[in-house]
Amino acid sequence: MSLCLAAGALVATLAVDAFTLAWTHSIEKIRWEEDWRIEAGRLHLVEARIHGSGAGMEPPEGAVLERGVWRYRPLVAPVERLRLANSAYTADYELCFDGRCRPLAEVAGSAENAPMELHAC
């Protein structure tokens, strides 16, 4: 399986079976990270991390604080598509794979702040 990034039409295909989606909270300026795995044509959320805490950003029950980072395993069903509504008023998402993080718009080769969908392909 691979990961497809789409903004209207197919933009990019990445030969990965796991990735991290990261972003900075628009108000609190705190980094969030989600580790995803591609299995059976779906995206599985494996782990999430919050680098601190703030208003409306309380970690869920069962989260563990390690060196200032809250770690937890979200109990959510796998999804076919992950829709990202980018905004001109917030920083771009980052997509991390192969040991490197890059702005999502750079990876996809599209204009920054364009709405995007991630799905297995």
What are these regions (language model features)?
Residues C4, G8-P59:
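N-terminal secretory signal peptides
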Residues P59-C121:
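Mature, soluble, non-transmembrane domains
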